[in-house]
């Protein structure tokens, strides 16, 4: 899919993180897990993708040299992504309640 002249790419680490969030949120009710994944994907495609540079640059302690940006959904979940000239790569998604020092971004 192309939005704003950039191809949207879901990195394998992003997909894996979504699966982990779905499992965590759906522990007692699978619908809640699926609904969370849908909200994050909709947020990425409908809010981030059209205006990727409107969210702040973000330095993750475990990846200080990568040109990342982070967008936060409802103060609980964050989407980490990289903006390139022809691509918008969604790298990772996580709960903001996690210890950031423990986050390991996929390459």
Region roles according to the model:
Residues 1-68, 101-107:
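Basic, Lys/Arg-enriched alpha-helical interface segments
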Residues 69-107:
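Enriched for short, Lys/Arg-rich terminal
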């Amino acid at each position: 899919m192309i939005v704003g002249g950039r191809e949207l790419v879901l990195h394998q680490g992003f997909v894996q993180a979504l699966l982990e969030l779905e499992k965590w949120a759906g522990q007692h009710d699978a619908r809640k897990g699926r609904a969370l994944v849908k909200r994050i994907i909709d947020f990425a495609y409908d809010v981030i993708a059209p205006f990727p540079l409107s969210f702040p640059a973000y330095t993750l302690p475990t990846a200080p040299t990568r040109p990342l940006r982070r967008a936060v959904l409802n103060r609980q979940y964050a989407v980490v992504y990289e903006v390139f000239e022809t691509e918008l790569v969604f790298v990772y998604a996580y709960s903001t309640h996690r210890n950031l020092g423990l986050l390991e971004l996929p390459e």
